[in-house]
Amino acid sequence: MAATASPGAGRMDGKPRTSPKSVKFLFGGLAGMGATVFVQPLDLVXNRMQLSGEGAKTREYKTSFHALTSILKAEGLRGIYTGLSAGLLRQATYTTTRLGIYTVLFERLTGADGTPPGFLLKALIGMTAGATGAFVGPPAEVALIRMTADGRLPADQRRGYKNVFNALIRIAREEGVPTLWRGCIPTMARAVVVNAAQLASYSQSKQFLLDSGYFSDNILCHFCAIMISGLVTTAASMPVDIVKTRIQNMRMIDEKPEYKNGLDVLLKVVRYEGFFSLWKGFTPYYARLGPHTVLTFIFLEQMNKAYKRLFLSG
């Protein structure tokens, strides 16, 4: 008699056993949250820089380093972690959705023989996952922008949210639930730009380095390609990011919003602050992008390995 096969053993389609979809989503969020603990200060500095000099006012911060030292001096070490609860919730919503959907689509579109999707299909998967995550994430994004911006304002103008949940409840009660999705379109646009730019620029950068003859296909080459990719991605996405930041932080003036739409933000920034102000906060944005991506995938890889070892081995 032939032995009865154990559940999941000897997959007929040739694909290896994998974790349930719920676990993929969970690990994606946890990985992003772990990375955020390390890069939250850079997020805060980037947001402060993007709001500095808004509306033709004098810039509070001359450089990113000046912003960091000013925040430490005025608000203390704890001040650079302002908005951490919102940053964690953003990862729990945006990154959970983005990485979960990406992993599910990637596995579904992988061939029966294990052949991964081609470059264009990968790019489409990445943009779809990014845009979907960006639709889920705005409530936490709005809370994060406002919480990190509070410290730069005079005491009588601060919103004074105690934590992300207090922020969400107050925003919904005082300004209406739709305000939680303010800036949703530029947030989704940024996600598409970031995912497309990262994939395309990393692939091209790696190929350029290999073709130069000075690099082999090793960790040094991958690191340099990531840094070049981060530079391209930052340059491409920052104008959209500053639109998102300004819209999500804006107040009502005489019952009218400060900005009509994203295009109005772009025109006012260029008119009153200069064309290159669209790239305010470039340094902390770039410095955050690489480490956050690397840390997220390190945490994700370790959790996946642990799950396979504990639940899928044998």
From Swiss-Prot:
The chain crosses the membrane at residues 24-42, 83-101, 119-140, 183-202, 222-240, 281-300. Keywords: Acetylation, Antiport, Lipid transport, Membrane, Mitochondrion, Mitochondrion inner membrane, Phosphoprotein, Repeat, Transmembrane, Transmembrane helix, Transport. The modification Phosphoserine is found at residue 6. The modification N6-succinyllysine is found at residue 57. The modification Phosphotyrosine is found at residue 102. Catalyzes the transport of 2-oxoglutarate (alpha-oxoglutarate) across the inner mitochondrial membrane in an electroneutral exchange for malate. Can also exchange 2-oxoglutarate for other dicarboxylic acids such as malonate, succinate, maleate and oxaloacetate, although with lower affinity. Contributes to several metabolic processes, including the malate-aspartate shuttle, the oxoglutarate/isocitrate shuttle, in gluconeogenesis from lactate, and in nitrogen metabolism. Maintains mitochondrial fusion and fission events, and the organization and morphology of cristae. This is Mitochondrial 2-oxoglutarate/malate carrier protein. Expressed in liver, heart and brain. It is a multi-pass membrane protein. The modification N-acetylalanine is found at residue 2. PANTHER family: MITOCHONDRIAL DICARBOXYLATE CARRIER-RELATED. PROSITE patterns: SOLCAR. It comes from the Eukaryota. Its main location: mitochondrion. Belongs to the mitochondrial carrier (TC 2.A.29) family. The gene is Slc25a11. It comes from Rattus norvegicus. GO terms for cellular component: mitochondrial inner membrane.
